[in-house]
Amino acid sequence: TTVKLGLFTTDGEIVDKWEIKTRTENQGEAVLPDIAEALRKKLEEKKIDRDEVEGIGVGVPAPVNAEGVVQNTANLGWGYKEVKREMEELSGMRAEIGNDANVAALGEMWLGAGKGRKNIVMVTLGTGVGGGIIIDGKPLVGAHGAGGEIGHLCVNYEETDHCGCGNTGCLEQYASATGITRLANIRLAKDDAKSVLREFRL
């Protein structure tokens, strides 16, 4: 998977966008340093001084509390992590941290498909499955930062394989990119029938 990055004006105009590889080995210890380094290089390339930057917004595929802390990020290998503090220390810039689906929903409400609306629901599909719910212009965060986290609702109580979160039968195990790949591999292992998926070694 990749980390998507963007450089924007305060009016939301895209100055540049790019992506970097998500290095999840060793409990994802390289993810934040890689982001900080990618930002440093981009600012240098654009000849933008760090002091001119209002701040960094980071969307994390996990519940995030008000202090910018996550307890468990299945897809990145993080356990307890003070994302806000670490990002600010690594970058030397102010950082705001939120659940990725929530911040995506806020972006859509500001300038995208939800522009002009105060109440929207957004579903994100990728490595995982996420959900962002905006009510009266504010994200529904929930008591533990997991409001809208539909990817870890149990949809199959008979599942025996574990999700990245540690539970079984989560929606993410079936509807995400990784989940669909898992299901395809299970099906391919059942017989040796001809398959394009088998030929491409999914």
Label each region the model flagged.
Residues 59-60, 152:
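Short, flexible segments with low predicted structural confidence
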Residues 22-40, 44, 51-56, 62-121:
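Glycine-rich phosphate-binding loop and adjoining helix at the ATP-binding site
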Residues 1:
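Asp-based phosphoryl-transfer active-site loop
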Residues 6-12, 16-19, 25-30, 90, ...:
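Glycine/GP-enriched mid-protein hinge/lid loop-to-helix segment characteristic of carbohydrate kinases
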Residues 50-51, 191:
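A short alpha-helix-loop-beta-strand transition element characteristic
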